[in-house]
Amino acid sequence: MPRSLKKGPFIDLHLLQKVEKAVKTNDKKPIRTWSRRSTIFPQMIGLTIAVHNGRQHIPIFVADEMVGHKLGEFAPTRTYRGHTADKKAKKY
């Protein structure tokens, strides 16, 4: 369910401050964040943001197509290793 238009997009204040500082100083180091719920803003284009997936920080280079999406969409939290095969070989 999308967020109401009258509320506007959400971004954590501490993340916005880090992004503005990185843009002002032209810093290219990854910005580490645990805020998966924050929306990607146009100011973030060209920055690398390391988003926490519960175990480690996944570096994400923000492109213009990502604007409007959430940071958590690009750092998957679950690993699917496939279903296990049968231990006994089937005879036909």
Curated annotation (Swiss-Prot):
Keyword Ribonucleoprotein part of the UniProt annotation: yes
Native organism: Baumannia cicadellinicola subsp. Homalodisca coagulata
GO BP annotations, alphabetical order: ribosomal small subunit assembly; translation
One example GO MF annotation: structural constituent of ribosome
A Pfam family it matches: Ribosomal_S19
Lineage, broadest ranks: Bacteria, Pseudomonadati, Pseudomonadota, Gammaproteobacteria, Candidatus Palibaumannia
Endpoints of the signal sequence: none
Keyword line: Ribonucleoprotein, Ribosomal protein, RNA-binding, rRNA-binding
Role of this protein: Protein S19 forms a complex with S13 that binds strongly to the 16S ribosomal RNA.
Family note: Belongs to the universal ribosomal protein uS19 family.
Gene3D superfamilies for this protein: 30s Ribosomal Protein S19, Chain A
Primary gene name: rpsS
Transmembrane segment boundaries: none
Protein name according to UniProt: Small ribosomal subunit protein uS19
PROSITE patterns the UniProt entry points to: RIBOSOMAL_S19
GO cellular component terms, semicolon-separated: cytoplasm; small ribosomal subunit
